[in-house]
């Protein structure tokens, strides 16, 4: 076994919610109270910030307001970094698709992921996180490489593939809403070996909620209620060569 050292920074995530006491006291026609909705929205924004960094974060260090400021490498940066691969690898497991992609080309892009076995108890299976365009390409590849029949009286039609196989492994396709936020990410596919991935918190710095208002001690007469969610963590990929990325999935063809 050839050990490879992978380094990363921890990143602090903070999101704050607040509503005035007037807003708190205002009754809503439907749904949760204003306090509950604001708190829930804050939790959702906090989760999205963390998830975006886990996928697309880039490691950096600097300062803000005289204090140190760090960001972490996410899945994309780690898997794309050839220095995190054994010396036998000439290139990272990253492929940019052409204007069209066939099954043969898709298999060629994903096959190297199975040269590494992270956990012998886990079969050759990967999660494939994709955008909407990439999902349609993968679906088209399956549809154009097979046949299906429709019969009289049929009230629905079409094909929707959730899983596909290549010679050496299986991929479960998951369309991630975050990937649909722009056209570039929509054409991406990230193949993740779950046994290589984990979130590493700095000590006890798991998500913490600090509230103010609502009669909490030390509120100094705030005419509001609110709180702050704080987490400090990093993305941990133990075996980058077991993962992979495909860019620019544009159209599927037979072959």
Residue ranges of predicted features:
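Core alpha/beta structural scaffold of self-assembling particle/tube/pore-forming proteins
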Residues: 1-255
């Amino acid at each position: 076994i050839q050990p490879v050292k992978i380094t990363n920074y921890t990143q602090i995530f903070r999101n704050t919610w607040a509503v005035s006491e007037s807003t708190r006291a205002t009754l809503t026609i439907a749904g949760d109270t204003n306090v509950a909705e604001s708190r829930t929205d804050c939790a959702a924004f906090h989760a999205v910030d963390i998830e975006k960094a886990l996928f697309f974060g880039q490691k950096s260090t600097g300062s803000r307001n005289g204090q140190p400021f760090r960001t972490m490498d996410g899945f994309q940066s780690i898997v794309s970094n050839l220095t995190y691969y054994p010396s036998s690898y000439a290139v990272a497991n990253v492929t940019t698709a052409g204007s069209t992609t066939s099954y043969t080309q898709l298999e060629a892009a994903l096959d190297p992921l199975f040269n590494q076995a992270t956990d012998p108890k886990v079969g050759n299976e990967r999660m494939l996180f994709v955008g909407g365009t990439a999902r349609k390409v993968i679906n088209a590849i399956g549809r154009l490489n097979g046949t299906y029949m429709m019969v009289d009286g049929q009230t629905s039609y079409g094909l929707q593939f959730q899983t596909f196989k290549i010679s050496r492994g299986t991929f479960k396709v998951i369309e991630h809403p975050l990937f649909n936020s722009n056209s570039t990410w929509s054409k991406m596919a990230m193949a993740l070996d779950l046994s290589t991935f984990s979130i590493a918190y700095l000590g006890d710095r798991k998500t913490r909620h600090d509230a103010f208002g609502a009669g909490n001690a030390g509120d100094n007469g705030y005419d509001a209620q609110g709180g702050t969610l704080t987490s400090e963590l990093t993305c941990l990929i133990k075996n980058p060569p077991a993962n992979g990325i495909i860019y620019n999935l544009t159209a599927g063809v037979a072959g």
